[in-house]
Amino acid sequence: MSLKSERRGIHVDQSDLLCKKGCGYYGNPAWQGFCSKCWREEYHKARQKQIQEDWELAERLQREEEEAFASSQSSQGAQSLTFSKFEEKKTNEKTRKVTTVKKFFSASSRVGSKKEIQEAKAPSPSINRQTSIETDRVSKEFIEFLKTFHKTGQEIYKQTKLFLEGMHYKRDLSIEEQSECAQDFYHNVAERMQTRGKVPPERVEKIMDQIEKYIMTRLYKYVFCPETTDDEKKDLAIQKRIRALRWVTPQMLCVPVNEDIPEVSDMVVKAITDIIEMDSKRVPRDKLACITKCSKHIFNAIKITKNEPASADDFLPTLIYIVLKGNPPRLQSNIQYITRFCNPSRLMTGEDGYYFTNLCCAVAFIEKLDAQSLNLSQEDFDRYMSGQTSPRKQEAESWSPDACLGVKQMYKNLDLLSQLNERQERIMNEAKKLEKDLIDWTDGIAREVQDIVEKYPLEIKPPNQPLAAIDSENVENDKLPPPLQPQVYAG
């Protein structure tokens, strides 16, 4: 392995994470570097321009057709007759084709095909029950949450129900158009609460989170990785790419993390677990929360390793390493789902937006990873990618106990067992010493008591006056008053 002596590392200017229009919000590769707000503006401009161009094209074609028709009317009679017969034949043939197509796509055949598709796609009853239970739970939580807002809550619930009903009839639209509908709904509801309802911004954010949770729990199975997109193809491509890059080491990426430290190793495992867990969530906000937790574990791992706070230049290479090591399932589908249906304000600002933007950059870096990025020669990079060799194989040629990860872990465990054995021996010695001290203390107390008893013996002396017997005769009884004089009964 030929590594250059000077390592550049992976550096991304923080300004590159921001919207390229300069609005100050975070951009997104899926939005061509724009933030959600600027992308919507650019998208609408491009769409209006396309509509205008299509309208002009239609007008031009109509004029050409009218001119061609006018010129055909001025042609000779014979040619006109021949052309009319040709048109009649063409019309009859076209009518037969249309009739055949109509029969093929008749109502009965359409219904049958839909039933077949639904039966083919129908999940198991257990999955349906689980989804229904979760949907009911989220619905109840949403209604209970809106009850605290009284009239505003009623209006929000009404608008949300109307939106879901509208989305039910828009399933035939492209996923981009459905995403546009969701983004418009988020924008309109938030704006209506701020302008008409005078709701404080922090409460608007909480309400929007609950709205997103409610609607996306219901829409998830229809809009996550739909068949009309190439999301699944991208998932397979990035998984194949990550598997091909399994030989990449932390040193090649200049990752400032030492996994030999147990605390750091635990943080790395937790980060990988969080990024994998993202696929199990249904709400975009929950998926973002997994990315945020993963990123915080990365920052903690770097902080423990370096004994100082992590920087942005340390974070991105480590995030790339975590993605390569974890190979999260359906990574592109999850990124696209968050981009399309998450509340845009959450992606534009805050730590969620920052970490998500970095994840998008990490995926883009992995897709474009080359020899120069890893400070390798092109020859070594090609051999590693083809599987002919790997950096670990080359290190194993000069084998030492530290070169093998399994042996290294074994020695680490043996060292840990040795430390535990020493601690146990210390505890046993301390316990024996404590037992001996207790015995010595007991013997000392017994000796002291014996010495005191011998020094001060207990002597019982007889009394100087005899004790009065209880049953003896008392000659002075007659001096007592009558109520107190004892009475003697003959028995």
From Swiss-Prot:
Q: Which GO terms describe its molecular function?
A: DNA binding; guanyl-nucleotide exchange factor activity; small GTPase binding; ubiquitin protein ligase activity; zinc ion binding
Q: How does it assemble?
A: Interacts with RGS14; the interaction is GTP-dependent. Heterodimer with RABEP1. The heterodimer binds RAB4A and RAB5A that have been activated by GTP-binding. Interacts with RAB21, and with 100-fold lower affinity also with RAB22. Binds TSC2, GGA1, GGA2, GGA3, AP1G1 and AP1G2. Interacts with ubiquitinated EGFR.
Domain VPS9 span(s) in chain numbering: 232-375
List every stretch annotated Interaction with ubiquitinated proteins.
Answer: 1-74
Q: List where in the cell it is found.
A: Cytoplasm; Early endosome; Recycling endosome
Read off the InterPro entries from this record.
Answer: DUF5601 (IPR041545), VPS9 (IPR003123), Vps9-like (IPR045046), VPS9_dom_sf (IPR037191), Znf_A20 (IPR002653)
Mind listing the GO biological process terms from this record?
Answer: dendritic transport; Kit signaling pathway; mast cell degranulation; mast cell migration; negative regulation of inflammatory response; negative regulation of interleukin-6 production; negative regulation of Kit signaling pathway; negative regulation of leukocyte migration
Q: What is the documented function of this protein?
A: Rab effector protein acting as linker between gamma-adaptin, RAB4A or RAB5A. Involved in endocytic membrane fusion and membrane trafficking of recycling endosomes. Stimulates nucleotide exchange on RAB5A. Can act as a ubiquitin ligase.
Specify the residue ranges making up the A20-type zinc fingers. Answer: 13-47
The cellular component terms of Gene Ontology attached to this UniProt record, alphabetical and capped at eight, are: cytosol; dendrite; early endosome; early endosome membrane; endocytic vesicle; nucleolus; presynaptic endosome; recycling endosome
The UniProt keyword set, sorted, is: Acetylation, Cytoplasm, Endocytosis, Endosome, Metal-binding, Phosphoprotein, Protein transport, Transport, Ubl conjugation, Ubl conjugation pathway, Zinc, Zinc-finger
The UniProt entry, under SUPFAM superfamilies, shows:
Glucocorticoid receptor-like (DNA-binding domain), VPS9 domain
Protein modification: Monoubiquitinated.
Task: Kindly give the SMART domains that the UniProt entry links to this protein.
Answer: VPS9, ZnF_A20
Query: Has UniProt tagged this entry with the keyword ATP-binding?
Result: no
Q: What is this protein called?
A: Rab5 GDP/GTP exchange factor
Which Pfam family is an annotated match for this chain, by its short name?
Answer: zf-A20
Residue numbers bearing the N6-acetyllysine modification: K151, K170
* Main location group: cytoplasm
